[in-house]
Amino acid sequence: MTETLILRGAYAITDPRLGPRGVISGGAVVITDGRVVETGSFAALAPRYPGARVLGDGTQLLMPGLVDAHSHGRGLSPIQKGVRNDFLENALFDWAYMPILPPELTAAICAWRHLRSGCTLLHHNGFDDDGPEGARRAHIAIKTYLAAGIRLAFSPGVRDESKLAMGGEELIGTLPPDLREAARPFVFFDKAAFADEYFQLFDELYDTYNNADTRILLAPCWAHGASEAFLRRVRAKADARGGVMIHMHLLQSPVQKAYGLRRHGKPTVFWLDDLGLVDSNVAYGHAIHVTEPEIALMGRRGATSPAIRAATSTCAMASRR
């Protein structure tokens, strides 16, 4: 059944790029079955849709919904869970002690807070979504978001390297025997099987949920947390799915910048370019510690990191230093 709504406000911002010409005084927006049909003055539009339900009394501001392009869907911040902020590399260990809340709760809180703040589209970028538990939580989170009515991009994220620390293979050899045995599973595991499981989950989520309003993206968690073999498979999967978007954290801290130079012998973005991962369907979260030549390369390739700087997280993690 077709449903038509008229959103009525004192002002309707239709295109902020146009300045005053993009604002309609006494404006309204007509929506039919979830799609914007037209904009104009309420006085002109209302008589043309006599059966439409009107929301707003002419005193509100109407504006396009905001987009959160990089969120982890926690619902509560680490501080709210009892873990204070620190430098990123320290925080990764501290976060292991945060309570793990059920995904139906965290996704619901996240959706509610976003909608209340004017965000109508949310990107949930997962973190360590490997194993059966990761798959279970992904399905529940997506269903919860969709039930809330928010538009969604969802990217299951994993790391096949640097799960313990950057350069974990070198670190293992410096540890005493008892710690070495405890740390080995984080460094030495079947990476081919790990990747197979990840792409199986991605295909499952994509085939189940991807549509015009919900997008499933690929997400190596971090550029420095992915092997070259894994990233090549990510590129191949994106191509096989018609150019699906790829989202990853990039150069979030000075340590990551130094590690990339040492590991690859070149800036990280140039290494990613060798793998075909600087492209118009690749988005980077943060990308704080990039060089001028890397920025120029991203611009030439059409990569989208300038839009996803996650400034509050950057400041909280002291990553700007």
Where are these regions (language model features)?
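Histidine/acidic-residue-rich catalytic or RNA/ligand-binding cores of hydrolases
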Residues: 78-81, 164-167, 230, 254-266, ...
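Alpha-helical scaffold segments that flank or form the walls of functional sites
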Residues: 80-151, 196-211
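N-terminal metal-binding scaffold of metallo-dependent hydrolase/deaminase domains
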Residues: 1-48, 60-62
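Divalent metal-coordination and catalytic microenvironments
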Residues: 10, 29, 34, 59, ...
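Active-site-adjacent C-terminal substructures of enzyme catalytic domains
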Residues: 277-321
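Metal-coordinating catalytic core of metallo-dependent amide/deamination hydrolases
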Residues: 136-285
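A structural motif
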Residues: 119, 150, 243, 302-303
